[in-house]
Amino acid sequence: MVNAKPRLTVGITTRNRPASLQRCVESLRHIAHLQPEILVFDDASDEPVSSMLPSRPHLRVIRGGRGSGYIVGRNILMSEALADSVLLLDDDAALLESAGIERGLDILARDSGVAAIAFAQANEDGRPWPESMQPGSGQSVRYVAAFIGFAHLLRRDAFVALGGYRESFVFYGEEKDYCLRLLDRGLGVVYLPDALVVHAQDASGRTGQRYLRYVTRNDCLNALYNEPIRRVVWLLPARLALYYKMRFRWRIQDPAGLRWVLKEVATLAGAALRARKPVSRRTHAAWRRLRGGTAPYPAPRN
């Protein structure tokens, strides 16, 4: 008997966070009735996660061999997924209920102009994070510029057509780049502010120094990939100046950080320039409007 194609694939990337991963996988009980395919990308954890996770139907672990980063892992998960809709989760995320996920699935099934669903960040007790730390403002369903990568629902065919996440980013910033390219294709991101997903940030593997370096580096790469040259010439210095602003605001000791960023950008600039496809002025204008939070998503007609 041939198994039916699942309606949903859940993809989780993890590295050396066994407790967080177990909590994340256990939280999928909320959507068990959807019978999702569950894929876990183990990014070369010191102890393979396959030995920690309980055996369950439709769960498969994909073991990476070299610690290539979660962006590469997400691309692998998307390539392996069987479903048309894929819920990507960080290992320190956890579901609180099923309604938000089902609502997102319904939007993707009904509206071919929507390619991604953004969810709201919440504490473990279900309290939402401050509005400034969410994909958008307000409590109504709306289009937004980008989702937050900790939990997002993607239309797989759009992801494949766009070439997925840029693996050169390694860590951080892939959401903005991907959503900007989606917008340039005429596709949207819808934010469900009442669809809360836990983001219990696990400190393992996180450092302020790494975050600062990669955010600055990837903002520069984003400009090289997506901006017209007239904007690149001032955006690159502006992005580099922002490194110092963030460093002092967050009190991060990183005396060699800017040198590292400059070396990385110089190394990757040639490939980025060869692959660049600047987005249109119309896309930039739409992006600014969406960041302003003034684009409500229309309720479906019965």
Placement of each model-derived feature along the sequence:
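A short, conserved alpha-helix in the catalytic core of glycosyltransferases
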Residues: 146, 151-154, 158-163, 168-196
